[in-house]
From Swiss-Prot:
Swiss-Prot/TrEMBL GO biological process terms: regulation of translation; translation
Designated name of the protein: Large ribosomal subunit protein uL1
Cross-referenced PANTHER family: 54S RIBOSOMAL PROTEIN L1, MITOCHONDRIAL (PTHR36427), LARGE RIBOSOMAL SUBUNIT PROTEIN UL1M (PTHR36427:SF3)
CDD domains: Ribosomal_L1
Keywords noted in UniProt: Repressor, Ribonucleoprotein, Ribosomal protein, RNA-binding, rRNA-binding, Translation regulation, tRNA-binding
Entry similarity comment: Belongs to the universal ribosomal protein uL1 family.
GO molecular function, one term: structural constituent of ribosome
Gene name in the database record: rplA
Complex formation: Part of the 50S ribosomal subunit.
Purpose: Binds directly to 23S rRNA. The L1 stalk is quite mobile in the ribosome, and is involved in E site tRNA release.
Pfam families according to UniProt: Ribosomal_L1
Source organism of this protein record: Mycoplasma mycoides subsp. mycoides SC (strain CCUG 32753 / NCTC 10114 / PG1)
Length: 226
């Protein structure tokens, strides 16, 4: 069992066990209980009443955070038809099949996310088993398979985050950094919860959202009212 650090114990002591906090108070507490020396990420975790084994309850998508993520992502655009648009949108890397081969043959991953135009998807299928486990496979549901590569790159660079329910029905999303003002984190939280409610499967019965927890990198979990 991993040893709990003194800093984490001190942070944990500030959070009342089983208490569910109003959003503003929870965010303030998350900032107070950040245990790292760097600018930690603030994350929200939704525990949903879904069964991801059912096809109609597999939740996946992307949401634009109005206050941004506080993180810069390296974007790879794979295209044969929209090279100029991708370059003008300031994608970090732009190319075609030669980059797919580089991923396949050199285990190259000098990027955070892939945007692809539709004609590239058949070729990308050849490395689906490589990209899939890393969460890098482009998908129309997240807006990463598109002919409008300029918008996709712009959204990602500025403020878009992807989400996907795991096999336990949990969704984890970044809503900013500890250095963000509370108001900015609130903006992002509200955008995220609105999105999660929007994609509620029609077949879900009873309460859809079971609980919501806020945390920072290596910080304690804080339950949030909703």
């Amino acid at each position: 069992m991993a040893k709990i650090s003194k800093r984490f114990k001190e942070a944990l002591s500030k959070v009342e066990k089983n208490k569910v906090y109003p959003l503003t108070q929870a965010l303030d507490l998350a900032k107070q209980t950040s245990t790292t020396k760097f600018d930690s990420t603030v994350e929200v975790a939704f525990n949903l009443n879904i069964d991801p084994r059912k096809a109609d309850q597999q939740i996946r998508g992307a949401v634009v955070l109005p206050a941004g993520t506080g993180k810069t992502q390296r974007v790879l655009v794979l295209t044969n038809t929209k090279t100029k648009e991708a370059e003008q949108a300031k994608a970090d890397i732009v190319g075609g099949e030669e980059l797919i081969n580089r991923i396949k043959n050199e285990n190259w991953f000098d990027f955070d996310i892939i945007v692809a135009t539709p004609e590239m998807m058949a070729k990308l299928g050849a490395i689906g088993k490589i990209l899939g486990p890393k969460g890098l496979m482009p998908n129309p549901k997240t807006g990463t398979v598109t002919i409008d590569v300029a918008k996709a790159v712009d959204d990602i660079k500025k403020r878009k985050v992807e989400y996907r329910a795991d096999k336990e029905g949990n969704i984890h999303l970044i809503i900013g950094k500890v250095s963000f003002e509370i108001e900015k984190l609130e903006e992002n939280f509200k955008a995220v919860i609105d999105e999660i409610r929007r994609v509620k499967p029609q077949t879900v019965k009873g309460d859809y959202i079971k609980n919501i927890t806020l945390s920072t990198t290596m910080g304690p979990g804080i339950k949030v009212q909703f």
